[in-house]
Amino acid sequence: MRMSLKLVAAAAALASVFALTACDDKGSTAKKAEEPKAAAETKTAANEPLKVGFVYVAPIADVGYTKQHDIGRLYAIDKVGKDKITTTFVENVPETADAERVIRQMINDGNKLIFGTSFGYMNYMQKLAKEYPDVKFEHATGYKSAPNMTNYNIRFYEGRYLAGMLAGGATKSNVIGYVAPFPIPEVLQGINAFTLGAKSVNPKIQVKVVWTNAWYDPPKDTDSAKTLIGQGADVLTQHTNTSAVASAAEAAGKMVIPYNSDMKSVAPNAQIAALVLNWGPYYAKKINQALENKWENKPVWMHLKEGAISLENISDKVPADVVKKMEEVKAKINSGEFHPFTGPIKTNEGKEAVKAGETLPDDKLVTMNYYVDGVVGKVPN
């Protein structure tokens, strides 16, 4: 599979003072991330559990992107076995030099396999990979690699197309609101696939986007959702890492298709479906590879058909005929008969993006920098 992104996102602007929490899979003792110590021994003694570290950009307490990664960590512990691995995670790590400090501390604590789960960790992980060739590094949603560093992602756009179909069928106002973090290819793929899916069942729809310039900022997400509702949106979705958009939809009596996690707990009436990410099987696979000395630095871009992303808890607020059509399209995506970015596709400025009968190849997907027809506005610089 091809590697994912090709453009570097601006780092999320987060407070300079923050609390870092580290926990293992056997307890919940909290501690502040320590300053780096002298380099630890790089070889794990025979029969000792493999130490595996996870670095998170947001708290695991909030349903969303980081929560799904932690569910994946727990899945891996269950599948691989507590006798074989010990896992540690640090949450609320910003995409700054603090990420390097936290990862270096993990290395000094003896972790031999480290998963960095946010795009902005990429350069720090690559730097450390060169310094510590006996440690294996896995970076989510990035594109840089090294002999001991690879990257992994999910083809979110496949699920986004299907979610867009449901939103297009459910909307009454024909305005759908999309809260987005940074205008990088991964996010634009999602916006565009969602819009194409919505237009396939409802050509009248418009998708309006508000950019937060942050992966995790609940107040910004709330304000953005309120702005979109004020602009006429009656269905919302998001690419950010919080549950705030779902909560705002619930409070306003609107509909929402949350991304990352099922958010029925915060939006019991508003949620009409949930686009859920499943990282667990990948984590279990790569941890087992490391244990068996078969780890590979092969970039992976996982598909819908692999169960890496799924639409769950579809509400009866979505017309039955739209759900039926969505299931048919899902089957075609899984079989390879249909690709969300098969032409003809035009940008919202009327330019040809994909010719009729052609399918956008991966090297074009990972450099996407435009909106398709149906999205309102211009992509910010």
Located regions from the model:
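A residue-level marker of the well-folded mature domains of exported/periplasmic proteins
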Residues: 25-381
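C-terminal motif of bacterial Sec signal peptides marking the signal peptidase cleavage site
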Residues: 18-22
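Bacterial N-terminal signal peptides that target proteins for export
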Residues: 1-10
